[in-house]
Amino acid sequence: MSERIKTAALRDFSVSLCRAAGLSADDAALLTDSILFAECRGVTSHGLLRLPQYIARLRSGATASNASMPFTMESGGTARLDAQNGLGQLAGRKASDKAEELAAEYGVSFVAVANSNHFGTGAWYAIPAARRGFFAFNISSAASAMAPHGAAQPLLGTDPVGLALPRGEGKAPLALDMALSTAARGKIRYAALNGTPIPETWGLDAHGAPTTDAAAVLDGGTLLPAGGAKGSGLAIFIELLCAVLTGSGALGGTGLLSDLSRPAGTGHIFGCVDIKRFLPLKTFEALCEESLSRVTSLTPSQPGGEILLPGEPEERRAAESAANGVPVAPALRDTLNALAEELGCAARI
């Protein structure tokens, strides 16, 4: 059974491990913030589970621990950052801050990031920008895991999309953070572990046939895009923007986080729109609330059901985590404590 651990204790532990792996105090705190943002919101696939992978890449040199990440181009509302194979979260934060800065000056911004790594959850960047009055978006390339529509082999990444806009005082921004596969790879792994069948729409086996066997999807098979041709088409566009436009490489060239033999070569795009350039922010927020109330006031499709807006389930989990601590599975806890011992770090959870 998972034991709940206070966020402050998890933060101290994660920072200690990151410092032991060679990160500066500031960089360790930033990476930890990204990890706990995801963990506290229930997005466990991008939370503490990722910490051993990030540290393994840092220790092996697959990810650079001291990249300076210069901006190699700035023109009007656009910019390009070379992450120099540094941590994706550090590059992403620097780029998203630049996107806000440029949007404040020019009204809109478009910032490309080349030669990066896995950047965590898109909402971690978009929500703070939305709180400051911007519509914010981000997209990223990812390692090949998903077949293009009609194909039997993986080529596309799950290519996450993050969006957020402000809703006014006292309300969390409306936020959408999603990958473009029908189901997350983590869900399929969980089904395989428990021997439970999956819907045929989730993946193909190694022969290109739809399957309800989760293990067959993972063993030489492929994930399928959400919405068939629609999700596939959107993923192709994201790959061309994030891989090709940024200068990171060609479609399908992004490396796996677990592959310590090479740089990941991940590309990202960050952008912001300064809402008050179009209409007063308060007016925008009021009209959004009126519009969203029309959604939530509809009759639920299931008796006793509830209509939730994008990001609301995660905000509820975050509030629960803040009040009661974060549930950490025993196996993950053991893994993290073993890693701490290996690093010569005294911290434990």
Residue ranges and their predicted role:
Residues 3-7, 24-47, 63-74, 261-265, ...:
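N-terminal glycine-rich anion-binding loops that anchor highly charged ligand groups
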Residues 4-6, 10-13, 20, 250-349:
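Catalytic-core signal marking the mid-to-C-terminal active-site face
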Residues 15-26, 33-44, 56-63, 101-105, ...:
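Generic secondary-structure signature for well-ordered alpha-helical cores
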Residues 46-100:
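Active-site cofactor/substrate anionic-group-binding motifs, chiefly glycine-
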Residues 78-168, 175:
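A generic, well-ordered mixed alpha/beta core segment in the N-terminal half of proteins
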Residues 146-216:
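Phosphate/diphosphate-binding glycine-rich loops and adjacent basic-rich segments that engage nucleotide
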Residues 185-250, 258-263:
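Small-residue-enriched flexible segments
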